[in-house]
């Protein structure tokens, strides 16, 4: 896999059931996403910011690299992905999963990983 160009807005790159921005300030933002059982946030990383995932409803599976791990989260649980660490987010259950993503501190970018 190789890096693609970094983008400032990833909302058009993958489909979700629902997406809402709860707060956005320079260097920090909070988003809420709802993904269906077959949906995912594709492999990507951020150069400057960390992602903190917090599950509200359903189950979430997060796959990360360097080192390779699989994290399973249920409501009330959270996980932090450091800057530069590639990750993939999938629904870990049979129903929709709703979660918050706290992103910061720094300038937002989304670098998708693509197959060679």
Outline where the language-model segments fall.
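A short, N-terminal "cap"/entry segment at the start of jelly-roll beta-barrel domains
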Residues: 1-29, 42-43, 112-116
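Conserved short histidine dyad/triad with adjacent acidic residue
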Residues: 31-46
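Glycine- and acidic-residue-biased ligand/ion/polar-headgroup-sensing regions
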Residues: 48-50, 54-60
């Amino acid at each position: 896999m190789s890096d693609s160009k970094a983008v400032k807005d990833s909302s058009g790159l993958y489909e979700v059931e629902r997406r809402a921005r709860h707060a956005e300030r320079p260097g920090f933002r909070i988003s809420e996403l709802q993904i269906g059982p077959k949906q995912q946030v594709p492999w990507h990383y951020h150069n400057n910011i960390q992602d903190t995932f917090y599950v509200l409803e359903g189950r979430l599976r997060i796959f990360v690299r360097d080192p390779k791990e699989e994290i399973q989260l249920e409501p009330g649980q959270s996980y932090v992905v450091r800057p530069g660490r590639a990750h993939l987010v999938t629904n870990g259950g049979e129903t929709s999963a709703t979660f918050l993503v706290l992103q910061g501190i720094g300038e937002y970018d989304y670098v998708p990983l693509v197959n060679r």
